Amino acid sequence: MGRGAGREYSPAATTAENGGGKKKQKEKELDELKKEVAMDDHKLSLDELGRKYQVDLSKGLTNQRAQDVLARDGPNALTPPPTTPEWVKFCRQLFGGFSILLWIGAILCFLAYGIQAAMEDEPSNDNLYLGVVLAAVVIVTGCFSYYQEAKSSKIMDSFKNMVPQQALVIREGEKMQINAEEVVVGDLVEVKGGDRVPADLRIISSHGCKVDNSSLTGESEPQTRSPEFTHENPLETRNICFFSTNCVEGTARGIVIATGDRTVMGRIATLASGLEVGRTPIAMEIEHFIQLITGVAVFPGVSFFVLSLILGYSWLEAVIFLIGIIVANVPEGLLATVTVCLTLTAKRMARKNCLVKNLEAVETLGSTSTICSDKTGTLTQNRMTVAHMWFDNQIREADTTEDQSGATFDKRSPTWTALSRIAGLCNRAVFKAGQENISVSKRDTAGDASESALLKCIELSCGSVRKMRDRNPKVAEIPFNSTNKYQLSIHEREDSPQSHVLVMKGAPERILDRCPTILVQGKEIPLDKEMQDAFQNAYMELGGLGERVLGFCQLNLPSGKFPRGFKFDTDELNFPTEKLCFVGLMSMIDPPRAAVPDAVGKCRSAGIKVIMVTGDHPITAKAIAKGVGIISEGNETVEDIAARLNIPMSQVNPREAKACVVHGSDLKDMTSEQLDEILKNHTEIVFARTSPQQKLVIVEGCQRQGAIVAVTGDGVNDSPALKKADIGIAMGISGSDVSKQAADMILLDDNFASIVTGVEEGRLVFDNLKKSIAYTLTSNIPEITPFLLFIIANIPLPLGTVTILCIDLGTDMVPAISLAYEAAESDIMKRQPRNSQTDKLVNERLISMAYGQIGMIQALGGFFTYFVILAENGFLPSRLLGIRLDWDDRTMNDLEDSYGQEWTYEQRKVVEFTCHTAFFASIVVVQWADLIICKTRRNSVFQQGMKNKILIFGLLEETALAAFLSYCPGMGVALRMYPLKVTWWFCAFPYSLLIFIYDEVRKLILRRYPGGWVEKETYY
């Protein structure tokens, strides 16, 4: 980043004259950020570095120069991501998506009331009530959704912990602690074990310095840092330390080469906050649904408006009818139902360790077709564990299970005793204090990952390592360094009071070079060609499994030459380090989590492609991918085919290989077309040694294929990809704050298996929303048809506005919500992911089922009840046709019925309102059957069972509410609802039964003839 890419480039400093320019500028910036880190500071010699940054490498900057640079570059801090003001979030909830439909309904109601008030002396208040209720529904639901999201985002308020608070700099030769924000380019900085690196540094001197780069590159092993230039790629070279990574051990000095937003970490954070986030699938579904419902509402509204003008109504009356029909089509309760469904699912997911930040992401996870998963910590346990050992010329399997219930081997061999002693003594890792009651595998250790793995392995199989070390006290030690690649220590032997033992571990080939003999069955024998081949084969086999292999050897020092109290000199080496005895190998791996292979299998049967994207080594990545089933058994990569047929890789047709391992350096040179080719033609893909920017490129590639992509990540390096993906999933335990900020969902237990649970919940919520909507929309037909017949056939109004509201916001609410608790149908994880182009939340088939089939049967039930009651009161159906004008005439108090009885206006209205109540009750009765048939889309209700207790409660609740509204004293005045004869409740029963039988037969045909005509026309 140095001068070229660093200082002059500042994301914040770019402005353009006009809006269009700004957008182009922003796109250009993002493309700039997506490129690999451009930097040449790691290649410069120390003199060139000093000249470039005008700094004395021993004394640091002058205070004056530091102030000038600070004034020029600004503080060493990340620009916080732009946040949405709270009022904007609240308005989005009030006016977004579904709410718009209800607002339009409310405005139309007030308009209708205004027209009526202008025309009539005593206007009916129905439309006014309806408008107020609609507005109230939107406001209450909006507040509820806003509260839900605000609660989740509280958990997210972080980002502040990203920057280390203090830094140790050397200026004018003086060491001083300053606020990390005041560090400037060119500063000489010192870091030690436990510090966070305050800016991007070029190392000029170091002593055993190791840094943890896992949040940046995804490598779990601490990386050595030294002044040497070791790699072209600045992310891989040893002489650069990155802002906000942790120094684990040792000390180092370095020159600051970038600060704040210009650091590698800063670029990633800027990239993440600059990415455009697409709309969620469910938001698009709700938009599509609104268009459908609007069409369904406006078309009959306009048709009947024209018809009523033809029938001779005044145009003002026709406008009132038009508004009435449109409003009757608005499902008032549905907004609340959808919100509650999503909230319930989010709560259920939180119980299963998935924290959802925005409600709509719940469903996105269900429509996921590709998961790009990180390896370290998500698919694996993120703790190095001893996996295999080789001694006595045999490879033995160690126990890597989380509960230590796995493989065991014979621990009586004297060679194993020697090997375990070396691994325990030649080891600087220790358990942290106060963990006696915690199981060994879960204890925290101080020390490097490989040594901690050895410590736990020996503790489990041989008992306390501390006691072993106490019995064999250490008298000298040479720590591991990158030049000689071994670690050595000398101990007093417990089994021989006068002598010492020298124990050594390190890179296997280096250890073997020092050993002319090998220990087999406790006996030292010469290391001949045969044994060397055996060693080579074992080493290759373990290395091929992606494991990190260490060699162990020892030498019993002769007591004559090295008696107790001998002063061992580790600088001048006054003791032998050659002619040792080789004992064995131990190999370590970060093992897969127990539940992952099963979860990957579930993804496969659900049609979801799992791609591994990791910063780790290709061999390790491939081994883990095979271990968890991302590369399934029997599937080969190009390399495997070439090795099997013994031909060069260039001769293999890449299309023959189902699996594919792509190296980051190859990905760097690929065009988008080549990447698309790989994603299209290979079903099982592993990307290894990838950089953060490449993860983003991979996500965009998958999205170009039309996939809905979920990405998991824990490091800062993952945040751009998390933001760009359709759903970003961050890790709750190991995740950095930045990644949690960018994600839509957080896995509280860091376990890949929880994602699969999330996918199932997401699919379930989509299914259940469909069922809820189908249930809610069905009652629209028996609510609208009375109004239409009232206009066309001029009969007394069969169902009033107030009673419609009692259905939509009263009796239908709990049953509709209860469908959110419905268990999954048996095929939910066997289906292919939903195709967002063809499989809509509400499609034409659902509308035709709800309106054209079930809704019509319900309307018949309602009209049957209506005609029965009026006939019992003396008005036969033939007398009702055309009676409307006389019926509603306040001055007419002698209207005759079919038998010649005279009715006053008041008496007529009591009968009419009793009809409204009965029509309402019959809708409740037919909705019983509708609720039960909506439990399943394909299975029979008898297969699904009635285990949903909330649904049974919903049935009882809607019935109790209907009875209460009908029989409660005073309802005649408040809601104009009157008590019904018991027999009138039974009028709709046959229709309810008919709905149930009709739908069971339809589903039977669906199951018998999949893909047939019935499925094409009625499966929603």
UniProtKB/Swiss-Prot annotation:
SMART domains, sorted: Cation_ATPase_N
A family per Pfam: Hydrolase
Ranges of Polar residues composition bias in the record: 212-227
List of residues that carry Phosphothreonine: 570
Protein name: Sodium/potassium-transporting ATPase subunit alpha-2
Family (UniProt): Belongs to the cation transport ATPase (P-type) (TC 3.A.3) family. Type IIC subfamily.
Entry function: This is the catalytic component of the active enzyme, which catalyzes the hydrolysis of ATP coupled with the exchange of sodium and potassium ions across the plasma membrane. This action creates the electrochemical gradient of sodium and potassium, providing the energy for active transport of various nutrients.
Organism: Pongo abelii
Gene Ontology CC annotations of this record: cell projection; cytoplasm; plasma membrane; sodium:potassium-exchanging ATPase complex
Propeptide intervals in chain numbering: 1-5
Annotated positions binding Mg(2+): 714, 718
Alphabetical list of Gene3D superfamilies matching this protein: Calcium-transporting ATPase, cytoplasmic domain N, Calcium-transporting ATPase, cytoplasmic transduction domain A, Calcium-transporting ATPase, transmembrane domain, HAD superfamily/HAD-like
InterPro entries: ATPase_P-typ_cation-transptr_C, ATPase_P-typ_cation-transptr_N, ATPase_P-typ_cyto_dom_N, ATPase_P-typ_P_site, ATPase_P-typ_TM_dom_sf, ATPase_P-typ_transduc_dom_A_sf, Cation_transp_ATPase_P-type, HAD-like_sf
Subunit structure: The sodium/potassium-transporting ATPase is composed of a catalytic alpha subunit, an auxiliary non-catalytic beta subunit and an additional regulatory subunit. Interacts with regulatory subunit FXYD1.
EC number(s) per entry: 7.2.2.13
SUPFAM superfamilies referenced in this protein's UniProt entry, alphabetically: Calcium ATPase, transduction domain A, Calcium ATPase, transmembrane domain M, HAD-like, Metal cation-transporting ATPase, ATP-binding domain N
Transmembrane segment boundaries: 86-106, 130-150, 287-306, 319-336, 770-789, 800-820, 841-863, 916-935, 949-967, 983-1003
Active-site residue list: 374
Gene designation per UniProt: ATP1A2
